[in-house]
Each structure stands twice: as structure tokens, then as C-alpha cells.
Amino acid sequence: MNIFDYFKKKGIDTIDSSFYSKIAMWDSWYRANVKRFHQYRVYHGTGQYERCHRKSLGMAKKICEDISDLLLNERVTITIKDETTAKFVRSVLDAANFTVQGNEYQERKAACGTVAYVPYLTNMEVAEDGSVLSADIKLDYVVAKNIYPTAWENSRITEVIFAFPKTYKRKKYVQLQHHKLEPWQDKDGNDLGYQYVIENSVVECSSGAGRDLTPAEWNAIPYFEGLAARVETGSHQPPFIIDKLNIANNVDEDDTNPMGVALFANSIDVLAKIDLEYDSYANEFTLGRKRIFVAPEMLTDASGSQVFDPDDSVF
């Protein structure tokens, strides 16, 4: 499924797909597994190639770990004056494993430029008029490749679509959660300004733009059971938090792009040089090892089977 084909079909505008190619590139450097760099082939003649893996020091991940430890570590405390509120917030963060996940997603923010935190309600008790009487609060963590801004102002994202991929019975699905502002009125028709509305849809990841599931279809899938198609928050405050590095985005020709950039976005050449020289240094030891020269008649036994391991570089 091409999610940008889906957005085009639905008439949804977001950031150009080329920027998400850059996010994928940053992620590959973060994982030290860049196509056509860490994975390459060596030609041995007569049409034979050998697949090789270039060694890496993993410096992209290392600098992301370092900035993460500076931004959110065990010395950070969240202090709220009201004790009841403080206790409630601590319980929500503990349930979301924020001490661990928060630090990890600071690292992912440094790696790809942007992350998001999306609180949501579960185990809700709802009144007849649709208002929520009680519920538990949980927290979703979203990486950059699954964040699609649809409206922004002065680099502040005001409307956004979050993608949550799931696999069920070997079929891939994605929940698209669209947070957008709509006019808000009370029951008497009085204008209350704007409120955030959350629209959910589930798409089966088939070829092209995918296939939209009906609410009845997605409720049959455990991951999406009970998912509401539309939620009116009754608030003008965004029900999500976008977290990005305080670094200007200079990798996109669109200067208004509200997404962040990787900590090492402008140092790819440096990372490549480090890994190239480290790999060359390691190869010097491999190529400098002792070699044993063997007569051709000693390479096979009486039945013609090879005696030595052809992958053993000593012989």
C-alpha cells in the first residue's frame, strides 16, 4: 500500500513524499544498515559477485543515545503543585512506561527528527448523550515515518494524521487517526469557536491505495475492536504532542516544512567516512593474516569432494 496514493484518493494534503524518503535514509544510518553502502558486492570475474557487509562503528546511534541521555534521564523530575494532580499524572506515565519509553523516543527523535505522544481513552463509561463519565488514559508513541501533518502554522502542527500499522492473521492493516479542527457549537447553536475532532479509519494494506474497512469489518479485528469512527473532544487544545529537535529543517526545499530533521542530517558524509575507514582498517588485519599455500592435488579427496572449506581465507 502506498499511503500517499491513499491520501491523494481522499483529497488529503500533507508533506511531499520525498521528505519521508529522507526519514527512511536517516533511519538506515541510525541502524547502520544503509543500502548500497553497508551492503555491497565485489566482482570476482567470470560473472561472479560476492555479497559483502561493511563494518560500522554505529556513530549515528551513539550520538542519538548521548543527546537522549542529556534531554531525559533518571535525574529528570515532573513536579506539579497540586498533589492529587501530580499523583494522577504519575500513574498515567507509569502505566505508559514513560521512564523507559520517554528516553527511548528522545533517541528516536534525534535519529529521525520528530516523534509524537498521543494520549487516548480506554475502558470508557459513556452517558446517553455521548459524554465520557469515566475512563483510563493510555499513551501511544509515534515515530516520524508515521506522522503526516495536514495543517501547520509557524512550524507548529495543528492538524495531523497518525498511522498505526498492525498485522492480523498475516494481513497488514493501518489505523489512520486524523486530528483536525472543526467549528464548535453548543446544543443551542451558539458559536464556541473550534474543537478538535478525531476521525478514525482502518485500511487494509493491499496494492495501490489500499481498501477502506467499514466499522463492522474493523470491529471484527481484535486490535481495532471498539474503535470509534469519530470522537469530538470538546476542546480546542490539541490531543497530541509533537516533539522535535530545535534544529532548523534545511533538508527540504519547502522552508515551511514543520517536521524536524535528524541530529546528523547534515553529517552523512562524516558518518560514511568513519565507517569506510573503520571497515578498511578492519580489513587490513584480515588481509594481513597468514596464508597457507596448498598444492592443487590436495584440494580434493579420492572421490573428488573438496577437502578444504572454500570460504576459509587461510587456504
Task: Annotate each language-model stretch with its function.
Residues 1, 19-23, 145, 177, ...:
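Intrinsically disordered, low-complexity regions enriched in Ser/Pro/Gly/Gln/His and often acidic
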Residues 3-6, 14-17, 28, 67-70, ...:
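Short linear motifs in intrinsically disordered/low-complexity regions
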Residues 103-106, 116-256:
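Extended, regular secondary-structure scaffolds
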Residues 2, 11-14, 24, 56, ...:
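Acidic/proline-rich low-complexity IDRs
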Residues 5-8, 20-21, 38, 99, ...:
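Compositionally biased, low-structure terminal segments
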Residues 217-315:
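Extended, charged amphipathic alpha-helical segments
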Residues 1-162, 168:
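Extended, helix-rich architectural segments
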Residues 9, 43-45, 56, 95, ...:
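Intrinsically disordered, low-complexity segments enriched in small/polar residues
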